Amino acid sequence: MKVYFENYSYYPALRTRSAEMTGLNNLSYENKKKILPLISLGKWPRSEEIQVSLDKSLEVMSNLPFILDVTKDNSHHCASSFELLSPENGFKNWIEFCSRNDNIIPVVQMPDSAKLRDISIQARVLEELKGSIAFRIRNLNTDINKTLTSLVSMNSPENAIVFIDLGYIRGNVSAITAAAINSINQIRTEIPEAIISVLATSFPSSVTNFCRENGQSGYIDVIERELHQNIGGSDVAIYGDHGSIHSVVYDNIIGRYVPRIDIALNDSWYFERRPGMNKEGFIEAAKSILAEYPHYQREDSWGAAMIRNAAIGDIAGMGSPAKWIAVRVNLHLNKQIELSEALQYGFDHDEEDLI
């Protein structure tokens, strides 16, 4: 499918985990049309077939286009996913997999085991077959050269979007900003027309350091927008993030949890948590959120509806942390779509939402 990457103002990078897919799935169709998510395929629960994750992604995106990658995390692979990264026969497995559906915009795979020539051939074949492709630079030392070699071999570099994925940036913003600017300059020196999006996340692995004195609530500053402005804003790169998800995910932690609900504000995430409580803690947290931010009583997103339900004691199907991560993802995606539109068209937000 041929898409015009510059027509999108927000690129969220998500994974095929239940929480992230649920948050994305429950966006309105109108908002889904405004984004081009980068979805990394990984193992779906209780399945060893990577096709299950692809089918879930296609279902979630409601027949809209999305960018497709494969996880590089060994713990999230399944029996059938490793072969998609094989450079054999010019990445034949990956090319065939991505060719099964018109809505897929493939990421060019660049494993360490692949030769530059094989990567370039893969890019040209995918460009010819799909019309639009993507590159994802994770290692700034090695992936830029691989990407440039492929871009210059394409019929038109504007058929590609280049993601510079900076991962977790909290605590190292100045150095990462400098590295991002240097990477962008390297690419644009060779390909001035290159379309670039910068991805990052600042959501922490633990919120305890952000708690107020009561230990029950607090704010986490969103650094991704600050980074985007520091590299030059939308004139330089299109905004992207990891959908309010920490860059390293621990899926298999079993044991006690602290009930917590997070919401998305313009420049921070606000959370309410209830240490020492079981799932009823979600009810108390929801009540406190609505008291602190009453505009959530009116917001029409799925995430806001789940908070309103919980506040009146209805947590049916919402009694685990993963369900509330889905709520955070949903609220975050809605908020970033709203902010991206505001920055693009220059209109104001509701005053009460600027707290």
Curated annotation (Swiss-Prot):
One matching Pfam family:
Beta_protein
Question: Which InterPro entries does its entry note?
Answer: Protein_beta
Q: What function is annotated for this protein?
A: The presence of this protein prevents gop protein from killing E.coli.
Q: What is this protein called?
A: Protein beta
Q: Which organism is it from?
A: Enterobacteria phage P4
